Amino acid sequence: MFDLPRAAPLDMADSWLTFQAEEEQGQESFSSSVNLDDSLTSLQWLQEFSILNSNEGKTPSSSGDSHGYRQLSGAPCSPLAADPACLGMPHTPGKPISSSTSRASHLGLQPMEEIDYKTNPHVKPPYSYATLICMAMQASKKTKITLSAIYNWITDNFCYFRHADPTWQNSIRHNLSLNKCFMKVPREKDEPGKGGFWKIDPQYADRLINGAMKKRRLPPVQIHPAFASAQAAASSDSKRGSAWQMSVNSESHQLLKAFEEITNEQGWNPLGEHGWNSISDGKSHKRKQPLPKRMFKAPRLSSSPMLSQEEQTELGSLKGDFDWEVIFDSSINGFNFSAFEDLEVTPPLSPVTRSVDLTVHGKHIDCPQQWYPMGQDHAVAQNSLDFDETLLATSFLQHPWEENRNDYLSNSANIEQLFDLNEAFPAELNDWSSLGSYI
């Protein structure tokens, strides 16, 4: 095992410290030799920038430049201030280049009450053209005024219109022509000059003078008295109709209540033990007794055009009292409906019958067997379409047809069966042409 000298570690430490000192000196000399560009701005302020603190007081700068302008030492309050091209430039507003900017500056500097429109050419007066026309007419103290007088008064009292585009005169003419508040007065023959006069309509004078009509508005809608009375009558009819409907509903409710009481007294309830309420309350109650079946079918009456108007109205609406004994067929079901014996019902109308005359040139033709009704019930249950076809065939047989006429009967009926031509006429007369000459 070898023994190292004690002086070796001390020498190594001294040399290490010397190396560190030389390295630090080299870095300082390098940083001093390299000149960094001051125009390169750090973007770290973007992360800390906020609109809320942008209006806070600026920190005073420690030094000024040669021009005497102040430079910000802290973070700039806007990206424009951090631009190298903007460094050293005064941040003051420049000269306005448009008339709108000058108008805004004048409006911002002067209050609205202190603006003199007669001498200020930059501010437009806050009045509508209709108001300007009304002011000119009032200032003239005359019943009528010309268009040129209106122009002169506006230019004399408002400096803005003296320097503005003359298109405002077109707006004045349009307001005079289209606004209901102004009316034109024709010039008389003995009056000198050209053109007509203008004046304020007395109907709208108060509203226009008070400033209620600064803009063109249509007159209020006036309802004619005849239409107003018609609307009042319609509203009264609707009220009467609603009252009549309420009375009808109350009467029907009373009728149903009376019927339920009568059926309960007789010991028969068609809707179960819960009565009429079991229909609406279907979830909690169930019918214990089914409804009675219909034991007969009501005959369908034909809507024949031969019925009179009174009979048709009787068919359309039920008149008289109901015969509950017939409806519920008490004789079959075995129930006693003595309470309904006093009720009467109108008997059904008998079918319309008509004697048909089937005589052609003195020869009688018997009606087919199917034309005769089998009974009263059969006649009542006949369909209206079959009855109309019967009338059509009857009217056709009453009038002789022409020689070359093709009709319903000639296409569907057999001539030999109707007239028995095989027995009465020879074989050569069975043709249509010879038949016409024979008749």
Curated annotation (Swiss-Prot):
Pfam families hit by this protein: Forkhead
DNA-binding region residue numbers: 124-218
GO cellular component term, pick one: nucleus
Tissue-wise expression: Expressed in two independent areas of stage 10-11 embryos; in the dorsal blastopore lip (Spemann organizer) and shortly after in the ectodermal cells of the animal cap. As development proceeds, cells of the animal cap contribute to the epidermis and show a spotty pattern, which suggests expression in ciliated epidermal cells. Distribution of these cells is uniform in the trunk area of the embryo but more random in the head, being practically absent in the cement gland and olfactory placode. The spotted pattern becomes more dispersed as embryos grow in size.
UniProt keyword annotation of Signal present: no
Major subcellular location class: nucleus
Entry keyword set: Activator, Cilium biogenesis/degradation, DNA-binding, Nucleus, Transcription, Transcription regulation
UniProt biased composition (Basic residues): 284-293
PROSITE patterns linked: FORK_HEAD_1 (PS00657), FORK_HEAD_2 (PS00658), FORK_HEAD_3 (PS50039)
SMART domains on file: FH
Region annotation Disordered: where it falls in the sequence: 273-293
InterPro entries: FH_FOXJ1, Fork_head_dom, FOXJ1, TF_fork_head_CS_1, TF_fork_head_CS_2, WH-like_DNA-bd_sf, WH_DNA-bd_sf
Gene Ontology terms describing biological process: cilium assembly; regulation of DNA-templated transcription; regulation of transcription by RNA polymerase II
Localisation: Nucleus
Family: Belongs to the FOXJ1 family.
Role summary: Key transcription factor required for motile ciliogenesis. Activates genes essential for motile cilia formation and function. Required for ciliogenesis in multiciliated cells.
Name of the protein in its database record: Forkhead box protein J1-A
